[in-house]
């Protein structure tokens, strides 16, 4: 009987324990070219691995009160954003919402299409990127999170041969 009570208490404690919001999503960044020649287009991908049992809101939320997932680059001189591309969300119903919600689960790739301008400074270039999300499980949401992610690339003179890198991330669809 004592073992049953201890086991039940341990399970209740584990079920009620929510992880820290910062630990639910593990993001990594990838660049499509190495180096990036001046005048060339390239991509940066933010791949977010979402802990099982959790989801994050899509970029286009269906209710005004929801916090959308966003990727915001702080572009240095000579780099321009041409497009941000978010994946198609899942539509799911949860206990805490009367309506279906647009969410991401599992692994999510957000792509930024960028251009290295003809006057982009040569050498190492850092593009700070901020991932903003709110993670939830079926019954509750954690506080919103902003994660600063480093993207480091090399800008080369125009005409330099660029090598496509990270093909598993940037494969054509």
List each model region and its residues.
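Bacterial N-terminal signal peptides
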Residues: 1-13
């Amino acid at each position: 009987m004592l073992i049953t009570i201890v086991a039940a208490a341990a399970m209740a404690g584990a079920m009620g324990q929510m992880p820290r919001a910062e630990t639910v999503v593990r993001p990594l960044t990838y660049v499509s070219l190495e180096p990036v020649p001046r005048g060339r287009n390239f991509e940066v991908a933010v791949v977010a691995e979402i802990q099982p049992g959790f989801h994050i809101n899509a970029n286009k939320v269906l209710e005004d009160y929801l916090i959308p997932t966003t990727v915001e680059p702080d572009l240095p001189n000579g780099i321009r954003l041409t497009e941000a591309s978010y994946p198609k969300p899942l539509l799911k119903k949860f206990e805490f919402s009367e309506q279906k919600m647009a969410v991401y689960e599992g692994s999510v790739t957000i792509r930024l299409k960028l251009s290295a301008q003809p006057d982009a400074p040569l050498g190492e270039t850092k593009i700070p990127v901020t991932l903003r999300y709110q993670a939830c499980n079926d019954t509750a949401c954690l506080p919103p999170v902003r994660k600063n992610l480093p993207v480091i690339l090399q800008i080369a003179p125009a005409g330099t041969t660029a090598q496509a890198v990270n093909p598993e991330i940037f494969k054509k669809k």
